[in-house]
Structure formats: structure tokens, C-alpha cells
Amino acid sequence: MELVFIRHGFSEWNAKNLFTGWRDVNLTERGIEEAKAAGKKLLEAGYEFDIAFTSVLTRAIKTCNIVLEESNQLWIPQVKHWRLNERHYGALQGLDKKATAEQYGDEQVHIWRRSYDVSPPDLDPQDPNSAHNDRRYALLPKDVVPNAENLKITLERVLPFWEDQIAPALLSGKRVLVTAHGNSLRALAKHIIGISDEEIMAFEIPTGQPLVLKLDEQLNFVEKFYL
């Protein structure tokens, strides 16, 4: 069986080189075109889906919609869930990456961005831009909504969704598309493929490129490739 991952198209804050995380930003024109191209690739390669999973952030939802529209599958069920959100970048969200490196030093920012288990500084829950003040997450327990995450914590967040929804869908024979974010998809890929804590740091998923994971009947990893 095959599972398809797509990282959302290039966003407004990708273009501005800002830390995004759980902040909700839109796609750029480039991002829209990336999503259209991804949908056309899937159509040309004959990929059909029974269900699509995405996050509750606009850039991923729009990418999912565009991909499905371009591949003539906008009618299939979509499940939006916060567990597929991007990694939460804490107090760095909204900050310029270059300016942050100048303030804290390249090495410290590199550790925050690329180490597996070191989180950036927490975002104050009282901050107007905190997810605690976003009605998308109003029904979640306060201790579930993050103030900052590293990739290890992100994996711990996405894993229950894999086990409860994505894996059962695959095992039931459904053809699955997951349209999400760089780090939530990297976390899932780490679990599925069996990538080590060290190797995952160099594992990147480009925006708008369909990544196909081939799995056996027990969901063991076989191979991966981009369309």
C-alpha cells in the first residue's frame, strides 16, 4: 500500500523568513502554484484517495483543497485535526530567523531549530497570539495546548493521531493523503520509516512535493520516493 505526504505550499511567512509554528498564515502565489502542480502530478500518476487528513491551519487546509481539486477528488472526506499542526516554535513564532540568529547566536538558534529534544523558549499563554487564546483549541485541555515544542514532543503529539486514525484507515484498505507541515510530517516519517534521532535532523520535506511512502500489509516501511 502507499501513503502520500504533502507539505503545504510556500507560505507568506516562508517568504518573509519568519518562524511560523502554530501561527495561522496563508499561502503565497508560489505556494498555490506548488499545490496545483502537486495535484496535477497525482492526477497524471493515477493516484486516487479515499480520505485526506490535514491540520487546522489555513496553509495546510488550502493546500489539501487545491491538491484534491486539481486531481478531481475534492469530494472525498477530509479530516482536520490539531495534532497534525506544525511544530510549535514557542516565543520564536513571528520572529525573523536572521534577526533571531543575530540576537541569540547562530549556534543557539540552530540547536532550537534542529536538535531533536531541545525546545525554544515558551510562548506566554497570555500572549494575544498564543494558541490558548485561539478558539480552534478552546475545547482542548489547557495542558494539551503547547507553549513550545521540539521534534520529540511533536512526534508524541502526532503519534496518537497516526495510531487512532491514519493507520486504521490504511489497514482497512483506504488510500490516504496527509497534507500537513514540515515538522509534523517529519515526525510521522521518523516513526514510519524508523529514522534515528540523529538522522532525522538532516531529513527535509520540500513544500508542495508529493512524498510517497510504500508500506507492506502490516504498515512496515518498504521504500519512499517523490513524484
Curated annotation (Swiss-Prot):
SUBUNIT field: Homodimer.
| Superkingdom field | Bacteria
Its source organism is: Histophilus somni (strain 2336) (Haemophilus somnus)
Quote the EC number: 5.4.2.11
- Kindly provide the name given to this protein in its UniProt entry: 2,3-bisphosphoglycerate-dependent phosphoglycerate mutase
Q: Does the keyword Isomerase apply?
A: yes
Protein purpose: Catalyzes the interconversion of 2-phosphoglycerate and 3-phosphoglycerate.
Q: In what pathway does it function?
A: Carbohydrate degradation; glycolysis; pyruvate from D-glyceraldehyde 3-phosphate: step 3/5
Q: Name one GO molecular function term.
A: phosphoglycerate mutase activity
